[in-house]
Amino acid sequence: MLTLNTRINSADKVSAQLVLPYESRENSRLRTALSSGEEVAIFIPRGTVLRHNDLLMGDDGRVVQIVAARESTYRITCANPHDLLRCAFHLGNRHTQTQVGEGFLRIARDNVLKEMLEGLGATVIEEDAQFEPEAGAYGSGGHHHHGESSQGHAHGPLAPIPVHQKIHRPSDIPSR
């Protein structure tokens, strides 16, 4: 089985594609299959989120391109930027993973959130689309500490996320 364990910035040749929904692209340990059907294991640093067109190199030197799968989403638009900002605020207040586009927001389908957004005056359209939510203020690109105390270390205006913080996903709601 091919093991993909190194993220690279560019490659002369891409050997295969791996189509994954966002939820799978959040996993740093995953067993799945390439578009060709070949089984692969992803073993990358914890906390890494794979994005559309990312490249991973396998233990045999082959390069695999990540492709964001089309998923069941809602595309949210509003009559004006102020109303769209209000919708973004309420989604963020509920820790909902949200993709921010030019004049629209996109979230995974969730009927409760759809009703809330429509109540705020938004137009909510179901669509199958690639889902690329924002990494957030605490997402990749930040830094971490190896065993050192954070006392006396300023993080600027952003506070660390509490350990018990919950991110809302539609799959978190138990079915009846």
UniProtKB/Swiss-Prot annotation:
Record InterPro entries: UreE, UreE_C_dom, UreE_N, UreE_N_sf
Key words of the record: Chaperone, Cytoplasm, Nickel, Nickel insertion
GO terms assigned for molecular function: nickel cation binding; unfolded protein binding
Domain of life: Bacteria
Pfam family, one: UreE_C
Chain's role: Involved in urease metallocenter assembly. Binds nickel. Probably functions as a nickel donor during metallocenter assembly.
Family: Belongs to the UreE family.
HAMAP family membership: UreE
Protein name: Urease accessory protein UreE
Biological source species: Nitrosospira multiformis (strain ATCC 25196 / NCIMB 11849 / C 71)
